């Protein structure tokens, strides 16, 4: 479970146009954090509709891992189209590979998301084989083929 503080912009004015929305959003967050609801079914289908609404050009995902830039961590660089649920999909794959995240640097340039993860597995850098498997699964997930 990743928990952080995010600021969001309500471009569609959902909260302003729906008087009960604030309570609904808080209830939904409580359901997910407590484990009573899963995030994936809630996000399913929304990413595509948001991208279509914005008329966004697709940014081809690029995933790169590096064991040379840091003495303690494998550095994972990801560039992809900014989309609803992107960080969730990335963190799910990282978790499925048994990796721990020590630091995440996130940036958005227009519709391009640039995320850098400092990761380990069992408190050591990933092996070459582990890096290949992780980057392959991330690439497939971001391309929608996995």
What are these regions (language model features)?
Residues 1-146:
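Non-catalytic interaction/regulatory segments
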């Amino acid at each position: 479970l990743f928990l952080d503080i995010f600021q969001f912009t309500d471009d569609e004015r959902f909260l302003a146009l729906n008087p009960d929305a604030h309570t609904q959003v808080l209830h939904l967050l409580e359901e997910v954090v407590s484990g009573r609801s899963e995030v994936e079914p809630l996000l399913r289908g929304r990413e595509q509709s948001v991208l279509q609404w914005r008329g966004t050009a697709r940014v081809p995902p690029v995933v790169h891992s590096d064991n040379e830039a840091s003495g303690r961590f494998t550095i994972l660089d990801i560039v992809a189209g900014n989309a609803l649920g992107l960080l969730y999909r990335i963190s799910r794959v990282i978790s499925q590979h048994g990796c721990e995240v020590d630091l995440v640097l996130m940036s958005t340039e227009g519709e391009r998301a640039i995320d850098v993860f400092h990761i380990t597995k069992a408190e050591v850098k990933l092996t070459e084989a582990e890096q290949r498997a992780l980057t392959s699964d991330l690439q497939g997930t971001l391309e929608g083929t996995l």
